[in-house]
């Protein structure tokens, strides 16, 4: 089972007990306005998300980690890698993404978890490039992407939801935390 420890976090595969706390995160409009179509997700939809993330782990050898706070064991959210299917500018490439419950914002958890995920991409999966997209209006994600050393590579439009996106990439052959 893949686990990564950082000074404050445990990144791990999903457990049955994660469904309720992740559903609470997915029910928060402030969190979900930055994800996909911006709509909140039900517990059933969240269960489908976890199932899809676990399938990606089985098929690709990477996926979304559960982000757990060391000490308290509280689920803070999700971070990980996936093969992007859209927008066309990054389709087929490995993308990093995250979502954290609102109570965990502004504490550096997203940056800490994302750094550990990029290290995993290089050291455990041998990836040489990772991409990301963010909504143009999402300044908090822009800050995290900057801290990761990811470079803005242009813009795109979400083909399903119509949002304007900023596209980022990083050459992991020279990645250093």
Question: What would you call each of these model-derived segments?
Answer:
Residues 1-34, 64-177:
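Acyl-donor (CoA/ACP) binding surface of acyl/acetyltransferases
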Residues 30-52, 63-65:
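Conserved GNAT-fold acetyl-CoA-binding loop/helix
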Residues 56-60:
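Short loop/turn motifs at secondary-structure junctions and domain boundaries
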């Amino acid at each position: 089972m893949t686990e990564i420890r950082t000074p404050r976090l445990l990144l791990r595969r999903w457990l049955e007990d994660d469904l309720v706390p992740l559903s609470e995160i997915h029910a928060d409009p402030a969190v979900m306005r930055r994800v996909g179509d911006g709509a909140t997700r039900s517990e059933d939809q969240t269960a489908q998300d976890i199932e899809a993330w676990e399938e990606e782990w089985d098929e690709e050898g990477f996926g979304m980690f559960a982000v757990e706070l060391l000490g308290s064991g509280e689920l803070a959210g999700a971070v990980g890698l996936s093969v992007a299917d859209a927008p066309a500018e990054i389709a087929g490439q490995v993308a990093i993404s995250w979502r954290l419950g609102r109570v965990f914002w502004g504490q550096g958890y997203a940056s800490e978890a994302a750094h550990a995920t990029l290290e995993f991409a290089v050291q455990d999966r041998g990836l040489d490039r990772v991409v990301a997209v963010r909504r143009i209006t999402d300044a908090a994600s822009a800050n995290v992407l900057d801290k990761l050393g990811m470079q803005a590579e242009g813009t795109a439009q979400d083909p399903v939801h119509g949002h304007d996106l900023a596209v980022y990439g990083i050459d992991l052959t020279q990645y250093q935390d």
